[in-house]
């Protein structure tokens, strides 16, 4: 275990300990393979992107986030927001037509936003192809890496100029408040070529004017311990997600099981080259003639109320409780027990 005080530094202020946040950001940047990182207190990644202030009036933000579109309805005033229906190069290129931009810091700027795993059906975009196409279009590719996390995907290596990640899972669901890490790509390419997109993103982040985040020692301790145990915990999340996906895929009481590790997933081939150590902690499926609310009522309460990123399997309803879609985030609990509880609830619904 790394020593928190020696790694991050601290000073005593009014009886409590305030952390040297810059050292903590440097530790995250090293883990993410980033040139620089910033920590932001925000409820989710789009909110953090807004708070950073790097997407400016006059910019165009093209985003694939069909399960989180409302997050882009606020915080991007005077920006041209375009939501696309799929995370393909063709969709992003079409939405970018007629917008004349460059990588000059003054702007305006063109932003492309995707999740490494996200959207309905848990899509996995081809980040390599998107990264190349973004640079050709003079766009800055931003990746929300929350679901896959830094353990399961390396967006900056694959071509993103900026990677943002909500730290719920990194902190094992124990963070006192919601935090997001924003990481900018290194600008040095092969053969001493400079990556203009990364240089632009770095300049924007440097000049954003956002004050350094205040973290208490307790908050920093949770994040430091989370980083120290991240690989072991995330491998457990990923392995349990695979087991639960295989159980659900064979279950006649549900349909349309989406998990990038299943050969039936439309992005399975892409995912094998984009994701690492497995295929993420999430599984999505649809109920047959029942609503998400019906299933939640038949399950123990902790399945729906446990902390995001924690050790207990957690279910949500991305289309609302009246919809039939369920998203399961595997914990580190016994997948056989989780499958048994799910099976009992599904069979109960089938008899009603």
Which positions does each model-derived feature cover?
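Conserved C-terminal alpha-helix-loop-beta "cap" of PLP-dependent enzymes
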Residues: 253-330, 337-344
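Conserved residues at beta->alpha junctions
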Residues: 42, 329-332
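Generic C-terminal helix-cap and adjacent flexible tail
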Residues: 344-352
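Conserved PLP-enzyme active-site core in the AAT-like
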Residues: 4-7, 12-18, 23, 27-250
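Short intrinsically disordered coil segments
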Residues: 195-199, 300, 345
């Amino acid at each position: 275990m790394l020593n928190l005080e020696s790694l991050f530094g601290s000073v005593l202020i009014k009886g409590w300990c305030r952390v040297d946040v810059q050292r903590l950001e440097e530790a995250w940047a090293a883990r993410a393979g980033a040139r620089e990182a910033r920590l932001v207190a925000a409820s989710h990644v789009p909110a953090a992107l807004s708070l950073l202030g790097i997407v400016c009036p006059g910019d165009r933000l093209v985003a694939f986030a069909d399960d989180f579109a409302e997050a882009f309805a606020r915080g991007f005033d005077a920006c041209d927001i375009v939501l696309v229906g799929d995370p393909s190069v063709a969709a992003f290129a079409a939405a970018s037509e007629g917008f004349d931009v460059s990588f000059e810091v003054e702007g305006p700027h063109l932003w492309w936003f995707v999740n490494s795993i996200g959207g309905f059906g848990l899509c996995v975009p081809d980040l390599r192809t998107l990264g190349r196409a973004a640079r050709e279009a003079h766009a800055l590719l931003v990746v929300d890496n929350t679901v896959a996390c830094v353990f399961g995907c390396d967006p900056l290596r694959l071509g993103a100029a900026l990677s943002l990640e909500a730290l719920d899972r990194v902190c094992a669901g124990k963070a006192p408040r919601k935090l997001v890490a924003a990481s900018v790509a290194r600008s040095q390419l092969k053969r001493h070529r400079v990556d203009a997109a990364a240089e632009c993103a770095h300049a924007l982040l440097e000049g954003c004017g956002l004050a350094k985040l205040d973290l208490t020692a307790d908050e920093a301790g949770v994040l430091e311990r989370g980083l120290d145990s991240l690989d072991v915990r995330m491998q457990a999340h990923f392995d349990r997600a695979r087991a639960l996906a295989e159980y659900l895929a064979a279950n006649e009481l549900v349909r349309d099981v989406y998990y990038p590790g299943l050969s039936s997933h439309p992005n399975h081939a892409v995912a094998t080259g984009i994701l690492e150590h497995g295929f993420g902690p999430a599984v999505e499926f649809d109920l047959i003639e029942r609503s998400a609310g019906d299933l939640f009522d038949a399950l123990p309460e902790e399945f729906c109320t446990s902390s995001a990123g924690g050790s207990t399997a957690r279910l949500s309803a991305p289309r609302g409780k009246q919809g039939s879609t369920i998203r399961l985030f595997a914990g580190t609990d016994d997948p056989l027990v989780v499958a048994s509880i799910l099976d009992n609830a599904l069979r109960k619904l089938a008899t009603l």
